[in-house]
């Protein structure tokens, strides 16, 4: 089997297994909660299966479309995504939950435009950086406009507020700046400005300060800000090597909040043990490895940048989610790709998967023979 075909098989295989794990674990983690709140133990899994079906169709669509021809629409696509971010902030238009205004409600389903923005921004930046390759380090013509677009996008996400998504988007685009060949002096200036800005954003809001304190000292307030991460620790710790058994989690019994969304990895660790949790990590490593093989063998610079942005996005989201669950990072509120309940995120993941498959179908770049 040729290298690109192998990479494509690994990419699709790992993604399909992760999706299957997600279906099983969402039902396991949410059944009791959904019966208590909705009167139907299958409420969340039924909705998730709808998203899986739609996501599968979107993945097939993204894997077969002429994405290079779509480049001429990169700016309108990004403009639409930014417009949706503006509209979602309008009271009575965007749906507000827990003080955050991030969703549209459509026919009983929620749509989060920031998930669409992630794909749109990566697509636009890949096109922009490829078009500007001859003047890549021109401050006025290339660097500042790119930073302006990133600033507008991240700024609107911050207004929702959603710091985790804003940071993730910024990290991915920084990777693209680096890969495209931005001068090191510009990259250092960006880092120098970004670090204090991030520190300010993390400390400016009381609830974010509490999350930082809970990250360092969760046991100082075990019934308050430290409660969620402590329950995550208890879930992971009680799972041991082989787990307590599928469906037998104690932490999902109203102890661990967001057990079927942001903290589903903890339930995996509890029910399937270290073996199950490690298997999920290995599947993500396989997915990322296969994605990077596709990126390095991509036919042209645009495809390389697009693929790198997409695989970086899924990589960062997986690392951050797992990092939060094991206490290595402060609570961020990001879902685990392909596994967590969350329709908009799943649809974005499947579109990214489809585009990566699409890129893998092209002939390899010169210098990377299929031998």
Regions of interest found by a model, annotated:
Residues 260-261, 265-269, 343-351:
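Hydrophobic alpha-helical transmembrane segments and immediately flanking/interface helices
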Residues 28-31, 249, 340:
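Short linear Ser/Thr-Pro motifs
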Residues 214, 218-265, 272-276:
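TM-adjacent membrane-interface loops and short helices in multi-pass inner/ER membrane proteins
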